[in-house]
């Protein structure tokens, strides 16, 4: 009853592996993400990305490799009851891939009862799993703050409204949320990933900062 189905949610792939018996009738989903990110792969390896400036980084190459390894093991041993659905999900970074696959019948079409997924984590000993109740890793949330001021010469900041300085104060203050507004026993992290101005000159105060 093994099968591979492509094109779920446009580019998602699902493989079904059957166990030795099917007394339970259960279908367990094992999921990995396979996004590509705008990063140049300079490993020089034979299997590196063939598309300039794009690679399956951020652990996604590891996730897909682990799931392929799990699928291979399940196919070779089949020492389980029911079926396993190995799910390769696209567009995890943008948050749209899971919804697209579900909307395309992922759960109903394959009758999946439960989903399991893992994320690699540096510092955890090889061959072990770290689990806990509730969230275990940080999420990537998108927010944008646009500051509009008055540009000017860096030597005359009193004649300008220095949006770069204001933005720097905001970035520093964001960390006060963690240290002053959250229970110190809770795991919290806030990191701003980008900081852009509309000026590339060293001696110019920018008009706008994003």
Model-flagged regions — what are they?
Residues 32-34:
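Transmembrane beta-barrel strands of outer-membrane/channel proteins
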Residues 6-8, 48, 67, 94:
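Generic structural signal for well-ordered secondary structure
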């Amino acid at each position: 009853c093994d099968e591979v189905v492509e094109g779920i949610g446009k580019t998602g792939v699902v493989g079904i592996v059957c166990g030795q018996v099917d007394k339970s009738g259960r279908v367990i989903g094992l999921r990995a993400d396979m996004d590509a990110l705008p990063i140049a792969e300079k490993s020089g390896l034979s299997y590196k990305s063939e598309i300039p400036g794009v690679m399956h980084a951020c652990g996604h190459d590891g996730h897909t490799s682990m799931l392929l390894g799990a699928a291979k093991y399940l196919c070779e041993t089949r020492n389980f009851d029911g079926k396993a659905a190995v799910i390769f999900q696209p567009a995890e970074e943008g948050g749209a891939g899971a919804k697209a696959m579900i909307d395309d019948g992922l759960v109903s079409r394959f009758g999946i009862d439960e989903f399991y997924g893992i994320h690699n984590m540096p510092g955890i000993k090889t061959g072990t799993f770290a689990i806990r109740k509730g969230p275990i890793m940080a999420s990537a949330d998108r927010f944008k703050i646009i500051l509009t001021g008055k540009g000017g010469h860096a030597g005359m900041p009193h004649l300008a409204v220095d949006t770069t300085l204001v933005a720097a104060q905001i970035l520093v203050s964001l960390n006060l949320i963690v240290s002053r507004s959250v229970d110190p026993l809770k795991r919290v992290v806030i990191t701003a990933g980008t900081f852009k101005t509309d000026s590339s000159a060293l001696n110019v105060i920018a008009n706008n900062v994003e």
